[in-house]
């Protein structure tokens, strides 16, 4: 019998390794800066939300769920002053190709050969309620560059997973800050690094801790076993 849970865990880790590095890639940040954006401000938020950003800041804030509204407003407003979201997407994609060729050249040909199958998988997913996925699915697929196209397909699938994740959090009445605290504990990160990195301030953190405590997930100021099991 197929162990779908194990396969899903493997796929999750593989997709994270294939996609996640681009969010902090020096080449991507440099190319984004060269578009005129001061110090590459907001590279992560702008390039990840580019297919959705023309719908407006509030739409991106709603879709991203765990990132503070003021962070998103700053990043997208600065980007609009200096470039377009299409250009931000283009240079991010340039960095993807450069990075794959530099860091993992051994996978380039085989990954590229999977592009059509990966897009078939992406297209097969249910679209309802999956906003970021839908936006990425609708943008150019760069079929003329197979490895980039394959990467974009995996990214699209990964955003579908993210949309699903946020829907589950919302259904459980877990805020973005609370989710960050639970995930910090699960990963063994110190303190409140994840919600802080997404813009949470002291007041928001205090509120989140209080809510988690009331749900029985906190002991002595730390997420307890019940909280970890819930997460």
Model-assigned labels for residue ranges:
Residues 1-206:
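Phosphate/adenylate-binding glycine loop and adjacent helical scaffold
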Residues 198-231:
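Accessory, usually C-terminal, subdomains that scaffold auxiliary metal cofactors
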